């Protein structure tokens, strides 16, 4: 895992800057036209879910990107670990790693928003953090509207997210080159 971080530092930097830029741009443009902080927090929460869904699907499809050339395949297969350990390391790297990366990007975008807040004439309510509202939205995540308990709706929402994520993870295991587009094309058929 350490080898992946060191060899792919530029790719990891780009995968961090993408969510950071998305959060920062959404916070910037939505705060210019908003007067209600709750609407602003809902937009930031929606952006967080969108980044997790689309970015998570994209990174999951590159679970075995270390095997996209023959030389990289040989190098990866020669590592002193079992196949399960290698896959588990890559799985954690692209799933849990991306969630942590997105959360850190959201935190840094929030800090950047606080640093740039004195430059703009915004209402006093915007001088509070959106992170508690984002956390509350994460805990109450619902994709379907059906009669039942709120906990069950939240579980169904997260299971839907994991189900879609697993398709892209499976596509990343099947195809080494252009796995995201091939998996997306197969899902759309």
Residue ranges and their predicted role:
Residues 1-74, 83-189:
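Hydrophobic alpha-helical transmembrane segments of membrane proteins
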């Amino acid at each position: 895992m350490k080898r992946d971080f060191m060899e792919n530092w530029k790719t990891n930097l780009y995968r961090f800057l993408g969510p950071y830029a998305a959060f920062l741009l959404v916070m910037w443009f939505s705060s210019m036209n908003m007067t209600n902080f709750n609407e602003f927090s809902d937009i930031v929460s929606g952006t967080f879910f969108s980044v997790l869904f689309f970015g998570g699907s994209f990174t999951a499809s590159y679970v075995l990107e270390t095997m996209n050339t023959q030389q990289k395949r040989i190098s990866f297969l020669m590592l002193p670990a079992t196949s399960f350990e290698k896959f588990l390391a890559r799985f954690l790297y692209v799933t849990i790693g991306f969630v942590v990366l997105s959360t850190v990007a959201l935190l840094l975008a929030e800090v950047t928003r606080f640093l740039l807040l004195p430059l703009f004439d915004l209402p006093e309510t915007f001088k509070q953090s959106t992170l508690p509202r984002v956390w509350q939205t994460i805990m109450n995540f619902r994709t379907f509207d059906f009669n039942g308990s709120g906990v069950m709706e939240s579980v169904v929402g997260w299971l839907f997210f994991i189900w879609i994520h697993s398709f892209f993870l499976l596509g990343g295991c099947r195809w080494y080159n252009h796995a995201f587009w091939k998996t997306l094309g197969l899902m759309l058929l």
